[in-house]
Design a protein with these regions (language model features):
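Active-site-proximal specificity loops/subdomain of glycosyltransferases
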Residues: 42-85
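Short internal beta-strands
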Residues: 34-39
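Well-ordered, non-membrane alpha-helical segments in soluble/globular domains
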Residues: 17-24, 71
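Short, acidic, metal-binding catalytic loop of nucleotide-sugar glycosyltransferases
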Residues: 22-33
Length: 94
């Protein structure tokens, strides 16, 4: 079974706390890929921290809040890629 996750992230200062990294790295045991959708700008350090557990990081403007982020994350996966996934898990940092 192939599982993927879309993790929605927002921090007004773009800081990635340790618990975020721990969450992502621990879920990699269960998820084949994790796309992080950031609704806030990230610097290189924050991006690198997210990539410790994520397979991809996508930054976007904070429009549409969480739902807009999930929508854009699903669009980034694309229908062909989604068709190869058995389960898609949408989750966030709270």
């Amino acid at each position: 079974m192939k599982r993927a996750g879309i993790f929605l992230f927002f921090d007004p200062q773009g800081l990635v706390d340790d618990y975020i990294v721990e969450c992502l790295t621990s879920l990699r045991e269960y998820l084949d890929e994790i796309l992080v959708v950031s609704n806030s700008p990230l610097d290189d350090t924050a991006r690198e921290r997210l990539l410790k557990g994520a397979t991809e990081v996508f930054e976007r403007e904070n429009t549409g809040f969480d739902v807009g982020g999930y929508h854009d994350g699903i669009a980034r996966f694309g229908w062909d890629r989604l068709g190869q996934i058995d389960e898609l898990i949408l989750f966030n940092y709270t």
